[in-house]
Amino acid sequence: MAGKRKARDEEFIFTLSDEETPYINGGDFDEEDDDVAPSINKSKNTKTLKSRVEPSSKKRRNEESTTGHQNKKLKQQEQGQQKGLKGKRAIANGWDAENDSNGSGEDEEEEEDEEGEEGLLDSDFEFDIGGATNIGLVEEFDGWGAEDRDKQGNMGEAKKGVDLDEILCRRRQKKLESQEKKTREAAKSNVDDSFEGLSDDDGHNEDENEDNEMPNFDDDELLAPDAFGMGAEGESDEQGKANADKGSDDESMPDANGADEEDASDSDSVASPVAHPDDLRSDESSDSEEEDPEEVAKRNAFFAPEENPTKSEETSSNSTFQNFNLSRPILRGLAAVGFSAPTPIQRKAIPVGLLGKDLVGGAVTGSGKTAAFIIPILERLLYRPRKVPTSRVAILMPTRELAVQCYNVATKLATYTDITFCQLVGGFSLREQENVLKQRPDVIIATPGRFIDHMRNSASFTVDTLEILVLDEADRMLEDGFADELNEILNTIPKSRQTMLFSATMTDSVDKLIRVGLNRPVRLMVDSKKHTVGTLVQEFVRLRPGREGKRMGYLVLLCNTIYTNRVIVFFRQKKEAHRARIIFGLLGLKAAELHGSMSQEQRINAVEAFRDGKVPFLLATDLASRGLDIKGVESVINYEAPQSHEIYLHRVGRTARAGRSGRACTIAAEPDRKVVKAAVKAGRAQGAKIVSRVVDPAVADEWASKVEEMQAEIEDILKEEKEEKQLAQAEMQVKRGQNLIKHGSEIMARPKRTWFETEREKREAKKRALSELNGPDSVIKKEKRKLSGKEKKKLDDNRLREEGKIWKKGKKERESKGDMRSQGKGKAKKDKVKAKKAAR
């Protein structure tokens, strides 16, 4: 009996019943989970398995462990003898093995003591909701990860730009050396002079230090509403604003609901208020924005009828992504990025996108529009035929940074699928992009220019198989700057496709949308196109007439005292952003610039430096105003108001994203009145918080004077930078010549790259794009001609306002001066007569 029982024990095989199966990732492993299984904590599972083993099996396991240790001891001794080791060393190995066996026995005894606590929950146990632990949850994901950046490929055509920080560092070092030299010379002169006491210069320096102390803006939130742009609701507000403009030039703003008491008194003879021309224009534009019945009829005929779900359906049915019946790899990708619940635009757009319908979507900035079109695209691509790789989706973006960001978000969401991506962006290597296109990626994310370049010049790129077209920031893509390129793409790709358009300021013009080739699109407008986020505070700093030249002083003051961290400053022109970058560097403020004159490597490095917190300020043009999603942007400053209210909405939308709070400050002068009034009117209609920030003009003048003193140094830096650029270009030309000599035949054998426009048409398109961003005045070149009397008087008046009031001669001074001249002439004649007589 004992022999049979022993044989049965040896033949016994451990099995786990259904009840004993450990709960891993919500259930049994599927084929899709094979790559996740190894990452599970094995120690806890083995511990639970040991607690479920029968006592008879434990005895057999102890016997096996002892025999195993004895065999191990014999093997070690044999190995030691074969290698010619000494006997002592072999015995020592045996003792180690025995000690190990004793230790293992003690561990097993401890495990037997723990068997009584089967029902207790392990203190180290953590619930894994959705398998986020095993798939690597990314917190605060914003599409600018370093891992994805490494996979994007080398920038084969990257140009090494001039390092402005190096120039500023050299100049700072020279200045420090000169100051040290002066101090040493001054110390020597003080040693030579046996003068004791306090010098006048020292006292003067102390006074200057006291004057230069910055005020403390403790009450910066207790702000008064401004008459500038604040009177956007009625005629009484307009009158109050007109009366406020006639007041003193003090920077404090009167109340927008009425004028000062002195101006409002009936006894004073006050002229009838006259509206500002910009206010009249803005009123006309607001009237024109009212819906035209003909346009409404066109819209109703063009768009598909909207389905209005009930509130209960909106709240209950689509509260989570699981309710959209998405595939498991997509849900795992959403969990990895940290998306838990869909936003309003995602709740509306995902079901329509899954049905394959054309749609036009609009929502406020930071509401998740990118995921709203990527999620249905990925879900549809999971059911594609896989025998022949084919490019099926094209996503077009207006800027390179936005395309790179969308590429990173899409690849992260598709981590657990076999969907392939490619980004066609300027600044990256053409050859590497062509090699990727040869593999026929499923999704192509591109800017229009590079997309057309490959479409015309790359033999490996075909657009005949495209099934889905997405235009992100569609209102910008439909403007004149991109009109020609977009028409070229739309005329080439197949007409039978799904088209999706998204933007925060989506246009309602049917004439523009017809160009895209939409087929009864579904219109999904979650928010009004003129609205901002509710968590955004909009602030305005007014510059009085004649103080426009002090604008940089106001900006430096705000960046030094109020907005000191995670700030994006927007400029209209590249040269202004670059000049501000130099001024910030000279004042010791760390900043990065972002505009179109920089190389692609410099642009990405600037965004990364700001994102990682290496620099607190990002000085950018409208290149960064659309779509750029950087976590933690606290404030946005408009150096001057943009050309239109739509551009203003995109600029201020870089902060207060995804439910966070933020502030937007605009430094506004008289030319900016129209945009400011439109922003205030839309904000008040929405119920947003709008305030006017009061800035001490004396302190702003001090900073402006500091900037004026640096003008000569700024010009020297610009000159040095220009010389370094010329040297770099000369080196590049030399390398180009060397390559032509070495590989001339190969280079000449390459087919010439073609474009659908001539150089003249390119220049015209560029002018149209500039006029869209900065207005028609930015394109018109002023001809050199003689100024008329009115123009001279206008220039003189502007100069007098900037310089301030100066003394002028009156009638008495002119008359007295004339008398003195006549007296002087008579005296001179008498002196001449006397001299002649004396000579005779």
From Swiss-Prot:
Keywords linked to the UniProt accession: ATP-binding, Helicase, Hydrolase, Nucleotide-binding, Nucleus, Ribosome biogenesis, RNA-binding
One MF term in the entry's GO annotations: RNA helicase activity
Residue interval(s) of motif Q motif: 319-347
Residue spans of biased composition, Basic residues class: 824-840
Composition bias, Basic and acidic residues: 51-66, 146-191, 238-249, 786-822
CDD domains: DEADc_DDX27, SF2_C_DEAD
GO cellular component, one term: cytosol
DEAD box, short sequence motif: residues: 472-475
GO biological process: gene expression; ribosome biogenesis
Enzyme Commission number: 3.6.4.13
Domain Helicase ATP-binding: 350-524
Compartmental location: Nucleus, Nucleolus
Amino acid composition bias (Acidic residues), ranges on this chain: 105-127, 193-223, 250-266, 285-294
Record: residues binding ATP: 363-370
Positions of the Helicase C-terminal domain: 554-733
Chain segments carrying region Disordered: 1-133, 146-321, 766-840
Family: Belongs to the DEAD box helicase family. DDX27/DRS1 subfamily.
Subunit structure: Associates with pre-ribosomal particles.
Record note on domains: The Q motif is unique to and characteristic of the DEAD box family of RNA helicases and controls ATP binding and hydrolysis.
Record-given protein name: ATP-dependent RNA helicase DRS1
